[in-house]
């Protein structure tokens, strides 16, 4: 029989899993997500992608500010769920909540644990130059992404992949994997294995100070830095346009042959020298503007050597 589940998630990454579990016939007793926040130019309240999807599916939505009160625990238990599924919820679950459902809480994590425990596994995998990533279903405990692993799906990372590309590849894979895990849980065949502590790394939240491009680094490192921060927060540089510094985010680039002083513009196609080698910018975003192809940017803002970016 299908399970009665509590779903807990917030961003786009979690939506495919919610939809897949619903499509597979599981009874979603409640959807927990973060409260609406002001966003955009008008600072209007914006509900989360998970809340939007839940309402489209006709599912009840809860947005508690904390799970650490007796009232929150009582409400959680009152759903009489078999298990909870957690995907990028954005709030730490205390032990009493983890123990409030008889079959446990299961998390979908976007890394090959124990590598990249923490908040930004997709970005860190690309920024560090990992050859592969993946998604894992684990049974949650009180540690930070330390629970026993139930299922894994691996994916190769290419130089052309941005964080958005990897996110978009892993989200549907994760949805299918969690659905498989819930079938196994229902049938009593879910096999849990401890992670172990060998190879543990932590994916710290991305800080704004990390976003500035360091052109003195080798081209391959610059490419990984750019792609790992694309689209958010976006790796950036500044260039003087009409005598004033203008910040430009780089959303996609490629490795090319070339050499020069780090930050030097090498041609009229936005090829920029790095500490070793060079990169060519493919997609950029000027401050306050929409993302665009680099060649379209150049039509409105020609940049011609000799010129250096900062």
Curated annotation (Swiss-Prot):
Class of enzymatic activity (EC top level): transferase
Catalytic activity, as annotated: L-methionyl-tRNA(fMet) + (6R)-10-formyltetrahydrofolate = N-formyl-L-methionyl-tRNA(fMet) + (6S)-5,6,7,8-tetrahydrofolate + H(+)
UniProt keyword annotations, A-Z: Protein biosynthesis, Transferase
Domain of life of the source: Bacteria
GO cellular component, one term: cytosol
Chain positions recorded as (6S)-5,6,7,8-tetrahydrofolate binding sites: 111-114
Molecular-function GO terms, alphabetical: methionyl-tRNA formyltransferase activity
CDD domains in the record: FMT_core_Met-tRNA-FMT_N (cd08646), Met_tRNA_FMT_C (cd08704)
Amino-acid biosynthesis in keyword set: no
The enzyme's E.C. designation: 2.1.2.9
Pfam families named in the record: Formyl_trans_C (PF02911), Formyl_trans_N (PF00551)
Family label: Belongs to the Fmt family.
Function (record text): Attaches a formyl group to the free amino group of methionyl-tRNA(fMet). The formyl group appears to play a dual role in the initiator identity of N-formylmethionyl-tRNA by promoting its recognition by IF2 and preventing the misappropriation of this tRNA by the elongation apparatus.
PANTHER family: METHIONYL-TRNA FORMYLTRANSFERASE, METHIONYL-TRNA FORMYLTRANSFERASE, MITOCHONDRIAL
Stated name of the protein: Methionyl-tRNA formyltransferase
Source organism of the structure: Afipia carboxidovorans (strain ATCC 49405 / DSM 1227 / KCTC 32145 / OM5)
Gene name tied to this protein: fmt
């Amino acid at each position: 029989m299908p399970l009665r589940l509590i779903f807990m998630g917030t961003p786009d990454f979690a939506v495919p899993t919610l939809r897949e579990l619903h499509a597979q016939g599981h009874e979603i007793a409640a959807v927990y997500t973060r409260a609406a926040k002001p966003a955009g130019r008008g600072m209007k309240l914006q509900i989360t992608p998970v809340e939007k999807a839940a309402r489209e599916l006709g599912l009840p939505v809860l947005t508690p500010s904390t799970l650490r009160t007796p009232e929150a625990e009582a409400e959680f238990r009152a759903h009489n769920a078999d298990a909870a599924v957690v995907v990028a919820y954005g709030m730490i679950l205390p032990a009493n909540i983890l123990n409030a459902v008889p079959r446990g809480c299961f998390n979908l994590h976007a890394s090959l644990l124990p590598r990249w425990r923490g908040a930004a596994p997709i970005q860190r995998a690309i920024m560090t130059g990992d050859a592969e990533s993946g998604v894992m279903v684990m049974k949650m405990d009180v540690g930070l992404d330390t629970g026993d692993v139930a299922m894994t799906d691996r994916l190769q990372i290419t130089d052309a992949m941005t964080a958005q590309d990897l996110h978009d590849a892993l989200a549907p894979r994760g949805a299918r994997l969690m659905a498989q895990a819930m079938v196994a849980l229902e049938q009593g065949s879910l096999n849990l294995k401890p992670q172990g502590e060998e190879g543990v790394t932590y994916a710290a939240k991305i800080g704004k100070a990390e976003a500035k491009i360091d052109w003195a680094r080798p081209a391959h490192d610059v490419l990984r830095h750019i792609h790992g921060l694309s689209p958010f927060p976006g790796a950036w540089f500044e260039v003087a346009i009409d005598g004033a510094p203008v910040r430009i985010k780089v959303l996609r680039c490629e490795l090319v042959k070339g050499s020069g002083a780090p930050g030097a513009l090498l041609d009229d196609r936005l090829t920029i020298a790095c500490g070793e080698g060079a990169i060519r910018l493919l997609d950029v975003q000027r401050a306050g503007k929409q993302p665009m192809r680099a060649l379209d940017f150049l039509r409105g803002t020609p940049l011609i050597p000799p010129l250096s970016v900062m």
